[in-house]
Amino acid sequence: MTVVPASSTSDFYCHQAIPGLVPIKVVVETEDVLAFEHTNPSHPVHVVVVPKKHTSSLIDLGAGGEELLAKVMAVVGEVAAQVKEEHGAASVTTNVGLYQESQHLHFHVCHRGESDEQILAMYGHHDG
């Protein structure tokens, strides 16, 4: 894997996950994007999708960022489709500012563990 150095702040993805310094279960990997099971999941299904090149956040993509974001979103879509197929629903989120614990663009693709009935009761529809 090719890694572009991160800024001086702590970046779990650049410093540990992408170079393979911590064990991760890879879900999808391309030349530019890595998707893996979260190392400290907050949901029963919790996958993180990151660009391998350091990118601070969704609002700070840098030069060439739009092309890289398109590649990341293609993997996010692939993972979300897998989660939806296996579990009936998927949630996709990203954070910026103080909500962003690691200063590296990343998306969470999750299934929170609700049953189909709980999802329908919460959202009042079925798009299946």
Please annotate each region the language model reported.
Residues 1-128:
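HIT superfamily nucleotide-processing domains
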